[in-house]
Amino acid sequence: MKTKNIVQLPLENLEAPPHTYEAVILNKEKFIKVLTEIVNMDEINSIKNRIVILKAILSNYMKDQEGILNIHANGDTVSLRRNILIAELDKIVNAQTKERANYYLKRLIKGIQEVKTNKINDINLLRWKEYDDIITDSLWIFDKRDTSGAHLGWYWGNFIPQIPRQMMLRYTKKGDWVLDTFLGSGTTLIECRRLGRNGIGIELNPEVAEKAKELIEKEPNNNNVVSEVVVGDSMVIDLKSILDKYKINQVQLLIMHPPYHDIIKFSKNKNDLSNAKNIEEFLEMFGKVVDNATPYLERGRYLVLVIGDKYSKGEWIPLGFYCMQEVLKKKLLVEKYNR
């Protein structure tokens, strides 16, 4: 059925191309000019007509009479996710009033013209829908662990790379510093390299630390960041001297993935948390790690605790809850994620 004053284009011209998740590069100046012209239109139907034409252009460049896809050699461009852009245009087409249509138009213009980030990450809040790699749910379900590049999964008890990656994307910017007090196989520092974060990892076992260092060095360091592996006991190690080496006073993210008490014995070292005689001693040792590390965490930043519960002789022991209680004793606030 034809709606009065609204251009009716063939359905195939309005359908997004097969790769709807790909980016579309637009002439920024001309696209904003067109959107601004649409905002200044008096009639809602006229607004919808122009938006329908814009959608057709995004689906078929041969229809680009506006020059939106005409990129000059030195011209300013903007890259937008095609499916998200089309969804935003659909909201305008479906708007019931001119005021609502203009609201969506002005929001789109603002998202193109401005970049709005905050202190703790590089996410552009005006275009947050484009960050598909950041999980926004509190329950995380991963089909499988990331085994790409230097992530070999050789170390028994290491955590999946997606966890530190998610935390760094959420809570750090490029160039920030990340401290991992239980480095293990080097998972955190490998992700630091990939994301352009400086990383320091403390590992009690010298052999494990050496293997981790070898793997980390195999990961390309395209961002020229620091990847420091230090052999030591996180309960007592002099973190200040390590930070002084790089002329920094604090880190922006603290990651802890301690042993799940004695489920896996990682060494024979008496200072290894997996050798704690009982839960009380384990928590005391863990508390010392927290005490030693948190003074170097920048105020307002995050400590990431990754730990699971355990069963022993038919009894469920809520290690996660107990460890969070230890963290709370240090006056930190808890924000929980499940995986």
Model-derived features: positions:
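Class I S-adenosyl-L-methionine-dependent methyltransferase catalytic core
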Residues: 1-339
